[in-house]
Structure formats: structure tokens, C-alpha cells
From Swiss-Prot:
Active site: 18, 143
Name of the protein in its database record: 4-diphosphocytidyl-2-C-methyl-D-erythritol kinase
GO biological process terms held by the UniProt record: isopentenyl diphosphate biosynthetic process, methylerythritol 4-phosphate pathway; terpenoid biosynthetic process
PANTHER family recorded: 4-DIPHOSPHOCYTIDYL-2-C-METHYL-D-ERYTHRITOL KINASE, CHLOROPLASTIC
Family per record: Belongs to the GHMP kinase family. IspE subfamily.
Keywords tagged on the record: ATP-binding, Isoprene biosynthesis, Kinase, Nucleotide-binding, Transferase
Binding positions for ATP per the UniProt entry: 101-111
EC numbers on record: 2.7.1.148
GO molecular function, one term: ATP binding
Role summary: Catalyzes the phosphorylation of the position 2 hydroxy group of 4-diphosphocytidyl-2C-methyl-D-erythritol.
Source organism per UniProt: Vibrio vulnificus (strain YJ016)
Pathway the protein contributes to: Isoprenoid biosynthesis; isopentenyl diphosphate biosynthesis via DXP pathway; isopentenyl diphosphate from 1-deoxy-D-xylulose 5-phosphate: step 3/6
Uppermost EC category: transferase
Length: 295
């Protein structure tokens, strides 16, 4: 991109949620990490980052998040990791419109980090490839590369082997029970299934989807168990990741919204459609197209 047309006005970027449509644990590596097979799909629902580039050399992030110092925020970490990698001397003001629940298993923090990397790579005109951005992202979190690449993906190994996938783009009712689940507590639980046989993506896509973490989470957290039991009355429903969010799948928006309407007002929930191309990827394409438009 020509530096003479650097965008200095605010730009807004989506930071979409994701679901693990299935999650199977196949074993452990020699260094203790769990080997798994999982299918990521994005949702057309999520946070937003509004970014204004400047020449201050500093990253500012608003608003403040309770109990999360800015230096620990993945957005701030991503922006500064990008500066360190490239030697970029520019800065940015980043405003986060936080919609997704924190710690819900739908990728909020990882998605935020990926959006910061993709957006600032464009706005600062750095020219890094998806592979280079994904490498930076992997140091911030295992799920960040999926969001950077922007395609629904089948993940294997410890999550680092990604194969683009095309699952059906269904409608989902996503519900967040009011509990905090520490991923480490689930993956270290003695009763966690760790020996599910590996299967090909084709076989998995044609099979009933499941989540090996779900049994443990339901056992430890009655609120999750109660919410899943309720959803299962209406549609196929599962845990995403290690939770706490659970989701039910439907063939239409109207079906999902009719069940959403039956939830009490104090339950955190939303309806969204699965997307195999991330809204972030689509927004980047729009900005790139606008830059190439004849003036």
C-alpha cells in the first residue's frame, strides 16, 4: 500500500466469536500437551475494535477492563508484538466494544488479538503474510492463528495443524451459564477422556458431533448441566471448548430465536449464524478493495 494514502481516520473491525463444533482428545504428547481434533467455525456475532492510527509510537486501549491491566490485555500484547516483530514506529488508539463474555469458550480474547494483528498489519502497511501473523498470534494463544487465517478449520495435534473446512453454516443459540471455568481444571481432571481414536475429517463431518470435555464440565458445574439439559429438549446441543458457553443448532434463524424467547431475561444468550469465512477476513477484503479503487 502506498504510504501517501495511509488511513488516519478511525476504522472499525469485527472480532467474531467462534464455536468448537466438535472436540475430541486423542492422547498426550511427551511434554504433557493434549493431542486433539476439533472443528472451528466463526459466528456473525462478536466484539468490535475501532482503531485510529497515529505517529506517537504508543498503543492506547480503551475502555479499562476491571481486573485486567492493559499490559495483560491480548489486544495490547498483539499490537506491541507486531511492533517488535517489524520495527514499526507508528502508534494507535484502540477502542474495544466488548460484547462477548470473557472466559466463555467462544474465543473472545483470542479473537481480539487476531483482529488487532490483522487490522494493524493493514493500517500500518506492514505487508506481513497470514503465516507471519499467525506465528505472532500463536505466542499469544493457541486459538489466535485460526482467527488470523479467517477460515473455518479442522485442528489437529495440539491445535497447531489447521486444515480449511466447510461445515454447514447453521444457526446457533449460544447460552453462557453464569460460571467461570478454568481450562486447566478440565484438562487436568483425572476422569477426562483422553483416548478417543483419531478419525479423518471426512469421517468426523459425517458423524454425530461431540465434545470430550462436556462430561467433566457438566459433572463439576451444575449450571452448565442444567442449561444443556434444557437446550437438548429442543435441538442438538453441546459445550464449546471447555465452556462455559453451550450452544444448540438449528436450520433457521426463526427456530433459534423462538427458543431464545423462552429463556428468562437474566440468562446471557444470543443467536448467530455460523460463518466459514470470518467477518474479519471479509472486512479486510473490503478495505483492501477500497484502497485499490480508482480515485
Amino acid at each position: 500500500m502506498d504510504a501517501k494514502i495511509m488511513i488516519t481516520s478511525p476504522t472499525t473491525w469485527p472480532s467474531p466469536a467462534k464455536l468448537n463444533l466438535f472436540l475430541y482428545i486423542n492422547g498426550r504428547t511427551d511434554n504433557g500437551y493434549h493431542e486433539l481434533q476439533t472443528l472451528f467455525q466463526f459466528l456473525d456475532h462478536g466484539d468490535q475494535l475501532t482503531i485510529t492510527v497515529n505517529d506517537s509510537g504508543h498503543i492506547t486501549l480503551t475502555p479499562d477492563i476491571v481486573d485486567l491491566p492493559v499490559e495483560q490485555n491480548l489486544i495490547w500484547k498483539a499490537a506491541n508484538a507486531l511492533k517488535k516483530k517489524t520495527g514499526c514506529t507508528l502508534g494507535a488508539n484502540i477502542h474495544l466494544n466488548k460484547i462477548l463474555p470473557m472466559g466463555g469458550g467462544i474465543g473472545g480474547g483470542s479473537s481480539n488479538a487476531a483482529t488487532a494483528l490483522v487490522a494493524l498489519n493493514f493500517l500500518w502497511q506492514l505487508g506481513l503474510s497470514d503465516d507471519e501473523l499467525a506465528d505472532i498470534g500463536l505466542k499469544l494463544g493457541a486459538d489466535v492463528p485460526v482467527f488470523v487465517r479467517g477460515h473455518a478449520a479442522f485442528a489437529e495435534g495440539v491445535g497447531e495443524k489447521l486444515t480449511p473446512a466447510q461445515p454447514e453454516e447453521k444457526w446457533y443459540l449460544v447460552v453462557r451459564p453464569d460460571v467461570h471455568i478454568a481450562t486447566v481444571d478440565i484438562f487436568t481432571h483425572p476422569d477426562l477422556t483422553r483416548n478417543t481414536p483419531k478419525r479423518s475429517l471426512e469421517t468426523l463431518l459425517d458423524s454425530e458431533y461431540g465434545n470430550d470435555c462436556e462430561k467433566i464440565v457438566r459433572m463439576i458445574h451444575p449450571k452448565v448441566d442444567k442449561q444443556l439439559s434444557w437446550l437438548l429438549q429442543y435441538a442438538p446441543s453441546r459445550l464449546t471448548g471447555t465452556g462455559s458457553c453451550v450452544f444448540a443448532e438449528f436450520n433457521s434463524r426463526s427456530e433459534a430465536e423462538s427458543i431464545l424467547a423462552q429463556l428468562s431475561d437474566n440468562v446471557s444468550a444470543f443467536v448467530a449464524q455460523g460463518r466459514n469465512i470470518s467477518p474479519l477476513k471479509e472486512t479486510l477484503a473490503d478495505y483492501l478493495s477500497a484502497q485499490n479503487r480508482p480515485i
